[in-house]
Curated annotation (Swiss-Prot):
It catalyses: 5-dehydro-4-deoxy-D-glucarate + H(+) = 2,5-dioxopentanoate + CO2 + H2O. Pfam families: DHDPS. InterPro entries: Aldolase_TIM, DapA-like, Dehydro-deoxyglucarate_dehyd. This is Probable 5-dehydro-4-deoxyglucarate dehydratase. Its EC number is 4.2.1.41.
C-alpha cells in the first residue's frame, strides 16, 4: 500500500487503537492479541493502530514492538489496514518505522519524541528524517512537546510526499482551523483527544471528520453507532450517547491519572475480552471504579 492509498483510507471512517494483551506476568500475549484483532476487525473500523498510546507503546521493548506489529499484520491481513506506532528519539523512531515497514504495516503514526522540548526547526528535521527513511505513509501525532505550527507543516508537506496525515491531540480548534484552511486536502486530519467522541462534532465542523475511538476496544457496536450518527448529522443519537454514556465515562476516567488506558483495558475485560493488566507506571482500576464502569457498560446492552 502506497502513501496515497493510506491517506485515502484514513480520510474516512472510524479508527481505533487496540489495547496490547499482556499475561499475568506482564509479558506480551500474542495469541490473545491476535484473537482481539480478529474480534474487532469485522466491526468496520477503517484502520487499526498497533502499538499506539492505548496499546502501551511507551512500555514495549524492542523485541516486543516487533512481535506486536507482526501479530497485528498477520491477524488482520486482507481485512483491515494496520498502522504502527513509532516514536521516541529520532533514530529510535526511524528504526521502528523501518521495522514496521519490513513487517508489512501500512504506515506509521509518529508518536511524540518525549521529555525534551524542541524548536520548530528541530521538530521539522525530526519528522523529515523519519519520513525519508521509509516509503509508506506517515501520520504526525500533534501532542505534548511535539507540536508543529502551520509554517512547519507547510515545509514538511513540500519536502515529504509520504507525510499524509495530521492527528491532533492539542484541542486547539483555532490552530486546527488554520491548518485545514492552509493545507486543504494535502493531508488527512484526525481527531485524537482522549474520549474523542466528545470533541468529534466540532472537529468535523472544521474539516476533520475522522477520529480514533478508544471505546471501540470494548463497545465496538456503540462506537460505530456514534460514528455513523455523527456522519449522518443524527444530532439526537450523538447527544443521547454523550449524555448517557460518554460524560459518565469521562468522570470515571478522570478519577486517576493514567486511567485513559487502564479504563479501556478494564472495559475489554468486562465485556469478556480480557487483555490482562496494564504495565507500570500505569495502574489498574480500583474495585469500585471497575464496578462503576461495568454498570455503565451494562446500560448499552450486548455488543
Amino acid at each position: 500500500m502506497d502513501a496515497l492509498e493510506l491517506k485515502n483510507i484514513v480520510s474516512d471512517g472510524l479508527l481505533s487503537f487496540p489495547v496490547t494483551d499482556f499475561d499475568q506476568n506482564g509479558d506480551f500475549n500474542a495469541a490473545s492479541y491476535a484473537k482481539r484483532l480478529e474480534w474487532l476487525a469485522p466491526y468496520g473500523a477503517s484502520a487499526l493502530f498497533a502499538a499506539g498510546g492505548t496499546g502501551e507503546f511507551f512500555s514495549l521493548t524492542g523485541d516486543e514492538y516487533s512481535d506486536v506489529i507482526k501479530t497485528a499484520v498477520d491477524a488482520c491481513k486482507g481485512s483491515v489496514p494496520i498502522i504502527a506506532g513509532a516514536g521516541g528519539p529520532t533514530r529510535q523512531a526511524i528504526l521502528q518505522a523501518q521495522e514496521a515497514e519490513r513487517l508489512g504495516a501500512h504506515g506509521i503514526l509518529l508518536m511524540p519524541h518525549y521529555l525534551t522540548e524542541a524548536s520548530q526547526e528541530g521538530l521539522v528535521e525530526h519528522v523529515k528524517q523519519v519520513c525519508n527513511a521509509v516509503n509508506f505513509g506517515v501520520i504526525f501525532y500533534n501532542r505534548s512537546v511535539s507540536k508543529l505550527n502551520v509554517d512547519s507543516l507547510q515545509q514538511l508537506v513540500e519536502s515529504c510526499p509520504n507525510l499524509i496525515g495530521f492527528k491532533d491531540s492539542s484541542g486547539q480548534i483555532d490552530m486546527m482551523t488554520e491548518v485545514v484552511q492552509t493545507l486543504g486536502d494535502r493531508l488527512s486530519y484526525l481527531g485524537g483527544l482522549p474520549t474523542a467522541e466528545i470533541f468529534a462534532a466540532p472537529y468535523k465542523a472544521l474539516g476533520s471528520p475522522v477520529y480514533s475511538s478508544a471505546v471501540f476496544n470494548f463497545i465496538p457496536k456503540t462506537a460505530m453507532e456514534f460514528y455513523n450518527a455523527l456522519r449522518n448529522d443524527d444530532f439526537a443519537t450523538t447527544q443521547r450517547l454523550i449524555r448517557d454514556f460518554f460524560l459518565p465515562l469521562i468522570k470515571i476516567r478522570n478519577r486517576k491519572s493514567g486511567y485513559a488506558v487502564s479504563m479501556v483495558k478494564a472495559g475489554a475485560k468486562i465485556v469478556g475480552h480480557d487483555a490482562g493488566p496494564v504495565r507500570p507506571p500505569l495502574s489498574d482500576l480500583t474495585p469500585q471504579d471497575y464496578e462503576d464502569l461495568a454498570a455503565l457498560i451494562a446500560t448499552l446492552g450486548p455488543q
